From Swiss-Prot:
It comes from Bacillus anthracis. ATP binds at residue 269. Binds 1 zinc ion per subunit. The modification Phosphoserine is found at residue 270. It comes from the Bacteria. A motif ('HIGH' region) lies at residues 31-41. One of its GO terms (biological process) is cysteinyl-tRNA aminoacylation. Its main location: cytoplasm. Its EC number is 6.1.1.16. The lineage of its organism: Bacteria, Bacillati, Bacillota, Bacilli, Bacillales. This is Cysteine--tRNA ligase. Keywords: Aminoacyl-tRNA synthetase, ATP-binding, Cytoplasm, Ligase, Metal-binding, Nucleotide-binding, Phosphoprotein, Protein biosynthesis, Zinc. Its cofactor is Zn(2+).
Amino acid sequence: MTIHIYNTLTRQKEEFTPLEENKVKMYVCGPTVYNYIHIGNARPPMVFDTVRRYLEYKGYDVQYVSNFTDVDDKLIKAANELGEDVPTIADRFVEAYFEDVTALGCKHATVHPRVTENMDIIIEFIQELVNKGYAYESEGDVYFRTKEFEGYGKLSHQPIADLRHGARIEVGEKKQDPLDFALWKAAKEGEIFWESPWGQGRPGWHIECSAMARKYLGDTIDIHAGGQDLAFPHHENEIAQSEALTGKTFARYWMHNGYININNEKMSKSLGNFILVHDIIKQYDPQLIRFFMLSVHYRHPINFSEELLQSTNNGLERIKTAYGNLKHRMESSTDLTDHNEKWLADLEKFQTAFEEAMNDDFNTANAITELYNVANHANQYLLEEHTSTVVIEAYVKQLETLFDILGLELAQEELLDEEIEALIQKRIEARKNRDFALSDQIRDDLKDRNIILEDTAQGTRWKRG
């Protein structure tokens, strides 16, 4: 089964064939670290971490690079407002970013380059563009000359005449064409700066990714990814800079994830529906947030609401409960061989369907459907009078494997059998002492942990709900 990726550049699904056999070079645009990330910022790390995980599962060696923009207009503004320097603010929010995305199940990139640590190669990149005639200096600023790059607009599929008609030259800009964009910005008084051939200043946003992608992944990369909002102008400008310099294809597959809406409204500060990750993960299990995000195909918009989140949680808990019941039943099962083939064959079908979904442009929504199918099938199997250790181990292994591919964990902070038995004994003692309030409290606490008690003439029985 081959993997197919929807390529924004061609607007169609294409068979994925990396430049080098069994190796994938992948660049994902990272955050500008001037504040905590919101849930819209968190979607790309989760989506493309899942893409990476699946590629690794399929046997690819993935070089995954995701940058930090640690000098920028927003950082300078934040520094001025807080009375701190730019590096201090950047360091704080780099650390906060790692805390947030790690909680959401994202692995660290192979490399997390920072702009300020790569200033030399950025300046060299700009100088080469100037030497080739693709860029020009204007009163300390350096701009990219878009009319010199014939392919400008090919990613966003917009005619250059339309782009030029909608563009304008802002006050203070000294560019020759409204479509030209800054590669280097002359420093204003009091701003952080670096020395360059054009005077003191700092790089423009777009050139940073081009330079760092080239440094760590080479002239041509396999997959370049990011949010839908980056396709134009950021990724369009990256293509122009990189291909003008090297004369080679910059990225072979372009992937973009969709937006997030809050209660059917576009997320924005003005509407007051701005949700920060470090706030939401205090309210909800980060694993639930990830499961929710992956329950929709990455190219589609997501509507984020508490009702939908709760509904998703119910589904996730059903899968985890089935997994817990399988683990609980493991010890009481035997090494039966009769009728194993049917159940194991069905498991193989679910595995195939999961991979078919992921091979189809990483359709995690359909892949998650197969997780539900495995859980439902497992529950049916557990109704059998006699169960086989071989089959139960196969269910457990499959659920663990599929969850791991999606960056999810099945491990529940659940009570051990011995702990449950001890609480039941404590409840029995409470009933003997006519302490019915304590007895009911223990029963309710166990119910909250998905442990169902049944009082019978033979004593108290329990099961995982």
